[in-house]
């Protein structure tokens, strides 16, 4: 938020739980230009306007409105899956594209984001391996997709991209799906913070695991156990 405020104009409205009044702030280029008490609901609303207005060179690298909107939508989807306890609402050109209920049910978030057909073809995953726990959902072998865009991984509630985790999931489906088809999944891996380094990529979407073999095995066997139970195999 600090980085965004340094290159935009921001109107912020916030009130803490139990506070009598809220506060309205107006910032430009990271500087607070006005601050005043106001009556408002609990929570925080942030309006960002004129992004990169003071850095025209950066503005030249902005993609089309459609591309930038798609990128923002993707981030909102990731956060909605990582935090089903928070309600997310995304509007584009005044039209609601996504609304999650914030009731803490990850399946409800999956339903809101990916739709009924995918949600109805997912199996729950919950397995432990050493100090790791793997939770979430994977699709049945009969409900695969044509690419990996439907795979979402979270480590300690942080969205990441990981070939290792994709490989672990796909290995569990070996001989169960056709070549060129991929399982969809939403998986959360909980692990000790010292077991993962999140500072290997500027966007922090790539991580380095202290023990890749252990992480691979934890995810692989958790998913394999789910598929075996669903198929009636011991």
Report residues per predicted region:
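N-terminal phosphate-binding caps/lids of nucleotide- and nucleic-acid-binding domains
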Residues: 1-234
